[in-house]
């Protein structure tokens, strides 16, 4: 774990500084990509133990997504599944001595939140076409500024929530180690693992809720719908 808030600079390329956060983030992605290729290159119709375990992981992720949106579980699996695989690894990197989680850097969590922000609208447009944006004018166009503010504030909250929790977790662990010395490593390690997994799950679940909500938006306003039901129109 690192005892500082800022991440150290590992490399200078002219005026450009490459921070440890960038290196560790790309390293995690490289490891996950290579592991995915190696683990899936020999898939069989008669799975062995390893393939059965991997299929169980995928089915578990798909089932969790289906609980929120059963109709679009397959379509959402690549995005949400990636979050639920990348984030636990990133959050748990701080357990390794001399390393710290890239998610304790606000720039990383902000980038992840922006991915969610753009994914919400991409999936919404893919589902409903450009008519998806009409829901920002519902129930009245005067509420458009409030809808826009809501979109940005929840994106900021998504970034700050993950950053704040991982940062506070590592700082609290450091303070406990300074006070209790070597009497506390095992409880701290367990706390770190549990909290890292919980925060990864929460981030992925919030992303799932936002994207699924966008895909379920209809182009018909509530006012039109209620007037039709009142008048008895089909």
From Swiss-Prot:
Coiled-coil region list: none
Locations listed in the record: Cell inner membrane
Gene3D superfamilies named in the record: ATP synthase, F0 complex, subunit A
Record's keyword annotation contains Ion transport: yes
A GO cellular-component term linked to this record: proton-transporting ATP synthase complex
Main location: membrane
GO biological process: proton motive force-driven plasma membrane ATP synthesis
Superkingdom to which the source organism belongs: Bacteria
Swiss-Prot/TrEMBL keywords: ATP synthesis, Cell inner membrane, Cell membrane, CF(0), Hydrogen ion transport, Ion transport, Membrane, Transmembrane, Transmembrane helix, Transport
UniProt membrane topology term: Multi-pass membrane protein
Gene Ontology molecular functions: proton-transporting ATP synthase activity, rotational mechanism
Residues annotated as transmembrane: 20-40, 76-96, 105-125, 162-184, 195-215
Sequence similarity: Belongs to the ATPase A chain family.
Summary of subunit composition and partner proteins: F-type ATPases have 2 components, CF(1) - the catalytic core - and CF(0) - the membrane proton channel. CF(1) has five subunits: alpha(3), beta(3), gamma(1), delta(1), epsilon(1). CF(0) has three main subunits: a(1), b(2) and c(9-12). The alpha and beta chains form an alternating ring which encloses part of the gamma chain. CF(1) is attached to CF(0) by a central stalk formed by the gamma and epsilon chains, while a peripheral stalk is formed by the delta and b chains.
Known function: Key component of the proton channel; it plays a direct role in the translocation of protons across the membrane.
Protein's name in the database: ATP synthase subunit a 1
Organism: Hahella chejuensis (strain KCTC 2396)
């Amino acid at each position: 774990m690192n005892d500082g808030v800022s991440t150290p600079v590992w490399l200078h390329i002219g005026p450009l500084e490459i921070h440890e956060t960038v290196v560790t983030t790309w390293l995690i992605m490289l490891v996950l990509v290579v592991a995915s290729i190696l683990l899936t290159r020999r898939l069989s119709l008669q799975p062995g133990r390893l393939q059965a375990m991997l299929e169980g992981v995928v089915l578990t992720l798909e089932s969790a997504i289906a609980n929120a949106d059963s109709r679009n579980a397959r379509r959402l699996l690549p995005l949400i599944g990636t979050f639920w695989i990348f984030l636990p690894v990133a959050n748990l990197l701080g357990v390794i001595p001399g390393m710290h989680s890239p998610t304790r850097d606000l720039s990383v969590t902000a980038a992840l939140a922006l991915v969610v922000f753009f994914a919400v609208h991409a999936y919404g447009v893919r589902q409903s076409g450009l008519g998806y944006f009409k829901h920002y004018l519902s129930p009245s166009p005067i509420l458009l500024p409030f809808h826009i503010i809501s979109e940005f504030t929840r994106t900021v909250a998504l970034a700050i929530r993950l950053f704040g929790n991982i940062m506070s977790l590592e700082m609290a662990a450091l303070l406990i180690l300074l006070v209790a010395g070597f009497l506390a490593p095992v409880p701290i390690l367990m706390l770190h693992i549990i909290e890292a997994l919980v925060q990864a799950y929460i981030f992925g679940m919030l992303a799932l809720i936002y994207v699924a909500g966008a895909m379920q938006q209809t182009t018909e306003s509530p006012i039109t719908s209620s007037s039709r039901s009142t008048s008895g129109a089909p």
